[in-house]
Amino acid sequence: MGQKINPLGFRLGTTQGHHSLWFAQPKNYSKGLQEDQKIRDCIKNYVQKNIRISSGVEGIARIEIQKRIDLIQVIIYMGFPKLLVEGKPRRIEELQMNVQKELNYVNRKLNIAITRITKPYGHPNILAEFIAGQLRNRVSFRKAIKKAIELTEQADTKGIQVQIAGRIDGKEIARVEWIREGRVPLQTIRAKIDYCSYRVRTIYGVLGIKIWIFVDEE
């Protein structure tokens, strides 16, 4: 049997970079890791509550965290940053306050910056949110995947593979369905592949979505 490995971890140091950049003593490492998770969860929850476009996409591609002794720099890569900034210019400050309250920092400064992504639908996280929104609205899974593949084609990607597992379309027996378009060379380390796994709650139960996007070869 072929062993499945996470494509991002497999390519760390070649085509993929780390999303958290900091150093810690071995005994404090787990604490730093939990801190990162709290920051990411807090940001995602805030965005979920405050912005949603009609398709159900929050638009966060990834969150990078850089830590120094006195400063934590958080960079949010978003596909649709206007949604967070428009209407309420103080939203970023509010978000900063929320995260600071969650982590109760006293002597550490927190700085949040938002970076816009040029082709949002070329990122698996945003695409998974789009498919999840469609499945929640009871759109048939094939239709949802086809639409997602069309969106990635506009983003100049070389290939995409989408897999959905669970009680698809409310069927009694859970199954796994997948569709591939173009090339997705998972064995090639120099191939830059973006990947995400996403859970979506529907009225029939939980579905798992996995997306592999072949961006380019280095």
Swiss-Prot record:
Entry-linked HAMAP family: Ribosomal_uS3_B
PANTHER family linked: 30S/40S RIBOSOMAL PROTEIN S3, SMALL RIBOSOMAL SUBUNIT PROTEIN US3C
Subunit structure: Part of the 30S ribosomal subunit.
GO BP: any one term: translation
Keyword Plastid: yes
UniProt protein name: Small ribosomal subunit protein uS3c
Keywords: Chloroplast, Plastid, Ribonucleoprotein, Ribosomal protein, RNA-binding, rRNA-binding
Main location: plastid
Domain KH type-2: 47-118
Keyword Phosphoprotein: no
Compartments reported by the entry: Plastid, Chloroplast
Lineage: Eukaryota, Viridiplantae, Streptophyta, Embryophyta, Tracheophyta
Record SUPFAM superfamilies: Prokaryotic type KH domain (KH-domain type II), Ribosomal protein S3 C-terminal domain
Protein family per UniProt: Belongs to the universal ribosomal protein uS3 family.
CDD domains: KH-II_30S_S3
GO terms assigned for molecular function: rRNA binding; structural constituent of ribosome
GO cellular component: chloroplast; cytosolic small ribosomal subunit
